[in-house]
């Protein structure tokens, strides 16, 4: 059974978690996810949506597989999950997670690997690892600290408190919170908007933010000039400058451009 698949419509790609109702991270998960990410990377998509079949985004790790395993097995399992999530972060296109129901543990971390999270009002995000004596194993703690601050990240990781869709929106974890019936449509609308945007500019923005995450403002400042200059001769930038200059000459707002991603 194919538990994760890659689909596309024109330049909008989609990775579907297809193991409902819980979409757990079992032993097959990382390999299937990496394969789907590679398919996305090798295609000419300009945006990627990650969504799930069934009532829940993902309940996280399939803990029933873990008892009786040794530490070397668990280390490899955790490493493979992290590699698959970092592969998503390494893509050169914007990424969107469409989350309904529960996003627990590794499911929460999968959503946090994306640039945008569209959350249903019934969504519940939770770092459940503390209930097993573990901590978030695929990057939730540090990514939460980056988004909501160290204090809140400690609270959510150490106390395992659930985060409602509404609270996720208030804290900036979720980009937008909508009715459950509107999650996919909202994510697809955002994806279509990004798919006709300046793709290289989006990739550069992601690169600069990664530099900031790694080394703060000094690290981002150190690479910002080169990243900016790489955009200067792109077709999108050339057309964008011209469109804006012409609008200024006519004393009006620049018209919306359909960028070609080059």
Language-model features, listed with the residues they occupy:
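Conserved CoA-thioester-binding segment of acyl-CoA-metabolizing enzymes
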Residues: 1-53, 86
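C-terminal alpha-helix plus adjacent terminal tail
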Residues: 1-9, 19, 160-165, 185, ...
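Hydrophobic/aromatic residues within transmembrane alpha-helices
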Residues: 15, 50, 62, 110-112, ...
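Short strand->helix junction
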Residues: 22-23, 56, 134, 176
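Hydrophobic alpha-helical membrane-association signature
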Residues: 29-33, 77-80, 183, 224
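Glycine- (often His-adjacent) and acidic-residue-rich active-site loop
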Residues: 32, 52-87, 103, 133
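Crotonase-fold acyl-CoA enzyme core
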Residues: 87-199
């Amino acid at each position: 059974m194919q538990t994760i698949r890659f689909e596309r419509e024109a330049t909008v790609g989609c990775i579907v978690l297809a193991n409902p109702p819980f979409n757990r991270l079992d032993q097959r998960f990382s390999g299937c996810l990496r394969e789907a990410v590679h398919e996305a990377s090798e295609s000419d998509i300009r945006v990627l949506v990650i969504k799930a079949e069934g009532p829940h985004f993902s309940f996280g790790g399939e803990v029933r597989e873990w008892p009786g395993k040794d530490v070397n097995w668990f280390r490899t399992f955790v490493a493979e999950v992290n590699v698959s999530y970092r592969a998503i972060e390494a893509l050169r296109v914007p990424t969107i997670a469409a989350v309904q129901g529960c996003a627990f543990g590794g499911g929460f971390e999968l959503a946090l690997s994306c640039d945008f999270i569209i959350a249903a009002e019934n969504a519940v995000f939770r770092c459940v690892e503390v209930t097993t004596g573990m901590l978030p194993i695929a990057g939730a703690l540090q990514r939460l600290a980056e988004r909501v601050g160290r204090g809140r990240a400690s609270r959510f990781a150490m106390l395992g408190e659930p985060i409602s869709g509404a609270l996720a929106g208030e804290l900036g974890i979720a980009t937008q919170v909508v009715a459950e019936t509107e999650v996919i449509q909202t994510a697809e609308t955002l994806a279509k908007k990004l798919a006709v945007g300046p793709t290289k500019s989006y990739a550069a923005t992601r690169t600069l933010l990664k530099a900031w995450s790694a080394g703060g403002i000094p690290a981002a400042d150190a690479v910002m000039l080169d990243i900016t200059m790489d955009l200067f001769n792109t077709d999108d930038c050339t057309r964008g400058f011209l469109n804006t200059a012409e609008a200024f000459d006519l004393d009006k707002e620049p018209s919306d451009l359909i960028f070609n991603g080059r």
